[in-house]
């Protein structure tokens, strides 16, 4: 072969090799349930046991819908506006079958098996959890690897490892590390300053799904309640809530439940934080989320704390009444909730922290579907507030 022909053949081979997809490699991930799971990656066919984890996939992969073969309907049920925004951005979602109506008891193992995923990513919440032994056994018996992630039950511990797991599964380790560095820098700014200043923590009432039920459903140090301590507050619920039945894997301090109005009035908290979302729109509760106007959220919040018992609390009398998007309890960018709460709890210490700017950077650098709406609100519009 002539040298010129040899060079031409070599160049052609290099082009073909560069265009060829990367071969799958066998990897082992250590999931948040403490299990070592071996599978081929990057995965091409994903089952999401909880639909809201699409947001986490979208942080890392440019076309997350192209990877989905089955998912749960919880995003559509809990935040239809967010669901519609993702459908508009990723039209392939309309072709992906739901295998659950958005609750663990409606999860169809048969439909999951029929979807033939490379991996089932489960996370509890509105889908099968690490306590769903029967579901896990059936999936694994059929040769489907099961990997657990978590942004809900213990977000402060599990957010970073969960994103690292997803990065490995998707072959997007570099992107995952970029997000983790961004996330950690925002969390460290809060925790480092609190550790140095050691301010007295205000007593905080977190009223979950505010306005939906009688006062007051409240988390302990689990789910969205986990952010109170790290933001420099004291959650009055952790002093009385006991371990719920059927949750042996959780510590007592991780409990959640109902606080009596009498207890709340006796504790007379310094700060009131209600959680809300679009799921409360038809229920007369606090509405926050994508596309929501801040005036609407502020009006809802005022109605909630005007109810007998709440209206006389110190937090209401002194204007320390706030609302936050409940879905922060199930997304990787929960650092926004921590920044906002830290500013509410210690406004002088964190007067230079700008959650609005943090959200703008998150939108520009990482989110393919920008968060635009009202995700936190105050009766006094001067503290941290989002409503663009």
Region annotations inferred by a language model:
Residues 23-388:
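N-terminal ligand-binding lobe of clamshell/alpha-beta domains
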Residues 8-19:
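Bacterial N-terminal signal peptides
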Residues 1-5:
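Positively charged n-region of N-terminal signal peptides that target proteins for export
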